[in-house]
């Protein structure tokens, strides 16, 4: 296909405006195309003929364009984001973007020759420059691309109304690609919802267990102490998880245990103890009571020299079991808003991911390991259907029937293997992080599980190869002992924590006292709505009051971080559901009235939930501050407690 100098100039203008650098480079490399341009009498009648099979992009350009426009202006007029598979001639996008409600149109294209041709014919520079038109090459999409799209505004906020539209029948030939793309987008939206928090009760449990665990955190060695004494003492970390493949790796792990730092999951700790393999670190992340039971053992001298790294929101039973057998444990936090509100920064924070293997991986990075080896990281069922090794405390088939089975690519990439959606989520999050580690750090990540699911980005090697090639000398074990702060420093932090928790109880009360007044005002206004001429003005006043209230809640992110942790998941779920009402397109005055009524009702229910959750947090803080009070009394700090309360 030969283009005029003017058309080439237009192509360059479009390319310059394109934000997607990879696509920009790929388009520049194209010199010719299998597509033939077919122009009709109408300026909008632009079709392409695929000369490889003599098929056309559209059967009837104008009819299909009008049909699409009618549908979108009727059903999807208020949708902030639209998704299309196939660029087509691009005219539909230019027409739809005349509607200011459409903030973004995301277009996925597999055959970028189509874009190459159309960039010579039509000017998309304005739409591309503003990113209202976003074009993605499905052949080049990475894990990170899906993650960034599905977790950012406004794409995440409107994820519950996501659907993928086919540009024309021509694109049905790419049905495998379409199904794969659709699946990945749906999965990534789901992951983003989990990441933002999908259960306020989980958040509440985290807050109450964190407050309950505060005295133990403050009176034991800190994460800062761990980093200062242990950073760089070893090059290679072995992360021991509890997949079915672990059993076959244990003899080799025992043989080479002295030559690597061993991080083990809480669930693999009793298994290693049984086989006489001493880990250097045992990590615990989950907040459940059943997880705490992995520490309900008396292994005697075996525990000497083991450092237990515990997330600050674990179940108190876990810490009670530990205190009976060792004082060598460190309690560390993530960057949760309530935890940051307390400003106990000395005890440290790090992002721990969603699984204990994830937590161990991050920890090994912070301790400057150059090689990270995963074993037992199956994230899939064994051939016999077992979810865990035979020695697993809760039985080898503990998760065998818990979830629906899903097929995923197996270790080695030659077959499929059964997994479930939770393991898949762990796998995807691990893959995202491995991608960043390999890209930005001088660290190699090896998957030596020799079974289970493939973890993209890791280097798959037999465990024996890793031991023989990466482990050459004994380490000086046990590593240097960690010490807690002086008693005076501990007392200072105990009082500081007590003060902040007391203030948070006060914040809950003050917030709810004001909030109930606003709620009552809005509810009374709503109840007095009558079918009168003033309804429209009255409704707008109520909606303005609602908007003010939501703004005040949003401001808590900056003003009162202690309240936002429990409200965050509630807000997320509410906004995701509200999107479905937001995009309803009323055709009549009655439709508009009904939409407004529904909008107000939803917000009143939301306000009731906000009040209830803040009240629940207040009660949880009052109950779980008791261990802190007992520790302060034990240390004869009663009079300081009184001062704090006043």
Predicted feature locations:
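N-terminal donor/sugar-recognition subdomains of glycan-related enzymes
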Residues: 1-237, 244-261, 270-274, 281, ...
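Short, basic, glycine/proline-bearing loop/turn elements
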Residues: 78-82, 235-239, 283-285, 339-350, ...
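Glycine-rich phosphate/pyrophosphate-binding loops
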Residues: 109, 268-269, 276-286, 364-391
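Long alpha-helical, hydrophobic tracts
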Residues: 252, 260, 342, 346, ...
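Active-site/ligand-binding-proximal alpha/beta "capping" segment
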Residues: 316-375, 379
């Amino acid at each position: 296909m030969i283009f005029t100098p003017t058309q080439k100039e237009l192509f360059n203008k479009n390319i310059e405006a394109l934000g997607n650098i990879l696509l920009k480079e790929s388009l520049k490399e194209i010199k010719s195309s299998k597509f033939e341009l077919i122009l009709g009498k109408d300026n909008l009648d632009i079709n392409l003929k695929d000369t490889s099979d003599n098929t056309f992009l559209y059967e009837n350009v104008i009819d299909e364009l009008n049909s699409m426009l009618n549908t979108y202006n009727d059903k999807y007029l208020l949708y902030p984001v639209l998704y299309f598979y196939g660029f087509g001639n691009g005219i539909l996008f230019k027409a739809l973007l005349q509607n200011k409600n459409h903030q973004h149109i995301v277009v996925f294209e597999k055959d970028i020759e189509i874009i190459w041709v159309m960039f010579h014919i039509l000017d998309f520079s304005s739409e591309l420059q503003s990113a209202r038109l976003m074009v993605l090459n499905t052949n080049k999409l990475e894990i990170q691309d899906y993650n960034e799209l599905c977790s950012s505004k406004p794409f995440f906020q409107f994820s519950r109304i996501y659907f993928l539209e086919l540009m024309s029948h021509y694109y049905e030939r790419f049905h495998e690609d379409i199904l794969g793309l659709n699946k990945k987008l749906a999965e990534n939206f789901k992951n983003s919802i989990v990441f933002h928090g999908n259960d306020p009760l989980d958040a509440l449990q985290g807050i109450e267990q964190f407050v309950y665990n505060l005295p133990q955190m403050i009176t034991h060695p800190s994460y800062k102490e761990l980093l200062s004494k242990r950073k760089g003492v070893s090059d290679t970390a072995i992360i021991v998880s509890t997949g079915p493949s672990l059993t076959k790796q244990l003899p080799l792990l025992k043989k080479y245990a002295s030559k690597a730092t061993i991080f083990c999951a809480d669930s693999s700790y009793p298994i290693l103890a049984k086989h006489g393999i001493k880990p250097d670190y045992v990590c615990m992340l989950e907040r459940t009571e059943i997880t705490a039971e992995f520490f309900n053992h008396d292994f005697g001298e075996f525990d000497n020299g083991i450092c237990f790294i515990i997330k600050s929101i674990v179940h108190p039973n876990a810490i009670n079991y530990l205190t009976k057998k060792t004082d060598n444990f460190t309690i560390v936090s993530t960057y949760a808003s309530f935890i940051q509100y307390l400003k106990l920064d000395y005890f440290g924070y790090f992002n721990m991911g969603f699984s204990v293997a994830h937590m161990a991986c991050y920890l090994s990075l912070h301790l400057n390991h150059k090689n990270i080896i995963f074993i037992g990281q199956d994230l899939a069922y064994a051939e016999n259907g077992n979810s865990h090794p035979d020695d697993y405390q809760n039985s080898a088939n503990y998760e065998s029937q818990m979830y629906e089975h899903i097929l995923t690519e197996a270790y080695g990439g030659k077959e499929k293997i059964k997994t479930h959606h939770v393991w898949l989520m762990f796998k995807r999050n691990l893959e995202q992080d491995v991608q960043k580690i390999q890209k930005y750090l001088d660290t190699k990540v090896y998957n030596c599980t020799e079974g289970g699911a493939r973890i993209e980005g890791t280097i798959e090697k037999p465990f024996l190869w890793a031991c023989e090639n990466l482990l050459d000398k004994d380490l000086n074990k046990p590593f240097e002992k960690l010490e807690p702060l002086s008693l005076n420093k501990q007392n200072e932090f105990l009082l500081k924590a007590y003060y902040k928790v007391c203030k948070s109880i006060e914040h809950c009360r003050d917030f709810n006292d004001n909030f109930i007044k606003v709620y009552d005002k809005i509810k009374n206004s709503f109840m007095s709505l009558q079918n009168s001429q003033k309804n429209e003005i009255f409704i707008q006043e109520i909606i303005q009051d609602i908007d003010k209230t939501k703004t005040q809640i949003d401001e808590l992110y900056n003003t009162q971080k202690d309240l936002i942790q429990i409200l965050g998941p509630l807000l997320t779920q509410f906004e995701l559901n509200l999107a479905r009402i937001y995009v309803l397109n009323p055709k009549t005055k009655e439709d508009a009235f009904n939409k407004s009524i529904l909008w107000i009702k939803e917000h009143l229910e939301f306000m009731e939930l906000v009040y209830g959750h803040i009240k629940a947090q207040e009660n949880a803080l009052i109950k779980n501050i008791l261990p802190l009070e007992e520790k302060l009394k034990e240390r004869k700090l009663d009079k300081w407690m009184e001062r704090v309360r006043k």
